[in-house]
Curated annotation (Swiss-Prot):
Official protein name in the record: Ubiquinone biosynthesis O-methyltransferase
GO biological process entries: methylation
Pathway: Cofactor biosynthesis; ubiquinone biosynthesis
HAMAP family: UbiG
Organism this protein belongs to: Actinobacillus pleuropneumoniae serotype 5b (strain L20)
Residues engaged in binding S-adenosyl-L-methionine: R36, G56, D77, M125
EC numbers: 2.1.1.222, 2.1.1.64
Chemical reaction(s) catalysed: a 3-demethylubiquinol + S-adenosyl-L-methionine = a ubiquinol + S-adenosyl-L-homocysteine + H(+); a 3-(all-trans-polyprenyl)benzene-1,2-diol + S-adenosyl-L-methionine = a 2-methoxy-6-(all-trans-polyprenyl)phenol + S-adenosyl-L-homocysteine + H(+)
Lineage of the species this protein comes from: Bacteria, Pseudomonadati, Pseudomonadota, Gammaproteobacteria, Pasteurellales
Keyword Methyltransferase: yes
Keywords: Methyltransferase, S-adenosyl-L-methionine, Transferase, Ubiquinone biosynthesis
């Protein structure tokens, strides 16, 4: 199935070389990663020994963090250069991560009765707002989740506040992200996400908002989901 926006892929292909530069194009993700890893570990009751799928893994920032926490990680993405960066960085750091260039829909289609991979934890971070059909991603994640597994989605709410902070603030004023990284009309309201999850027979256990202080460069979580947010589902 072709659930790909080539324009979106091209954006991330161009930024691949700076993926692991903590002061480069992905600085916000590097700053956010410890918080989201801690949240995932708490809600999943730890990652050690668990089988994890990172959907839209890009250059592997979260994949590596989860592998360091003891998980057996598979990372999938449709980009070429970011995946090469991910493989090289993992190898240089002695980490064994199974990176594959595939859509999650094709990943599901390639499952067989004799070899059906299921995962304890599935993460899909900052990806749904970059694809034509988010519901297809959500349904595919559900198909790969173990019955007692935990699924995490993070995305951006379609509000004026999010437009001002994520696009005007982060891309144009603070220049933390390249201009054009996000498109406002692709942002996803929590009610939309929850409706899609309900259609996929997933139930939201918790939803939290990400918040950022540009002075201290620190992220934190609270109940305000008017901008960036993360949802935990089963």
């Amino acid at each position: 199935m072709n659930n790909i926006d080539q324009t979106e892929l091209d954006k991330f292909e161009k930024m691949a070389a700076t993926w692991w530069d903590p002061n480069g194009s992905f600085k916000p993700i590097h700053l956010l990663n410890p918080l989201r890893l801690d949240y995932i570990q708490q809600k999943a009751n730890g990652l050690f020994g668990k089988k994890v799928l990172d959907v839209g893994c890009g250059g592997g920032i979260l994949s590596e963090a989860m592998a360091r926490a003891g998980a057996t990680v598979t990372g999938i993405d449709m980009t070429t250069e970011p995946l090469e960066v991910a493989r090289k960085h993992a190898e240089e750091n002695g980490l064994s991560i199974d990176y594959r260039q595939t859509t999650i829909e094709d990943f599901v289609q390639n499952q067989t009765a004799c070899h059906a991979e299921k995962f304890d934890v599935i993460t899909c971070m900052e990806m749904l707002e970059h694809v034509p059909d988010p519901l297809s991603i959500i349904q595919s994640c559900k198909a790969l989740l173990k019955p007692d597994g935990v699924l995490f989605f993070s995305t951006i709410n379609r509000t004026l506040k999010a437009y001002m902070l994520v696009i005007i603030g982060a891309e144009y004023v603070l220049k933390m992200l390249p201009k054009g990284t996000h498109e406002f009309e692709k942002f996803i309201k929590p009610a939309e996400l929850l409706n899609w999850c309900d259609m996929a027979d997933l139930r939201c256990q918790e939803m939290k908002g990400y918040h950022f202080n540009p002075v201290t460069e620190k992220f934190w979580l609270n109940n305000d989901v008017s901008c960036n947010y993360i949802a935990m589902l089963k």
